[in-house]
Amino acid sequence: MPAKAQAAGKKGSKKAKAPKPSGDKKRRRKRKESYGIYIYKVLKQVHPDTGISSRAMSIMNSFVNDVFERIAAEASRLAHYNKKSTITSREVQTAVRLLLPGELAKHAVSEGTKAVTKYTTSK
């Protein structure tokens, strides 16, 4: 553990970089994926005059990731129990019913069904 704390203290240390070959392109930073734009769109639908801080957005993003992982894990478990190798909308719907309480599950299932219907009709 002390080695990690020591390494964190050497943030500003600079090493000489090897010269790049002339054909190399500048490397791009990996993009951080987030649900931020979708959270913002929903916020504007519900409360058009309300904003959101970057900290609140980060918390909401973590929440969405957590719920997604829980639903995916439960759907995977259900598929495994039924000796299926594919997670279908049926497993996802059952996972949502198991994970979310009462009225929230009903709303989530109806919104999910609506989204799947919209997707299949657009194809």
UniProtKB/Swiss-Prot annotation:
Ranges of biased composition (kind: Low complexity): 1-10
UniProt organism field: Strongylocentrotus purpuratus
Name of protein: Late histone H2B.L3
Chain positions carrying an annotated carbohydrate: 110
Ranges where the record places region Disordered: 1-32
PTM characteristics: Monoubiquitination of Lys-118 gives a specific tag for epigenetic transcriptional activation and is also prerequisite for histone H3 'Lys-4' and 'Lys-79' methylation. GlcNAcylation at Ser-110 promotes monoubiquitination of Lys-118. It fluctuates in response to extracellular glucose, and associates with transcribed genes.
Record GO cellular component, one term: nucleus
SMART domains: H2B
Gene Ontology molecular functions: DNA binding; protein heterodimerization activity; structural constituent of chromatin
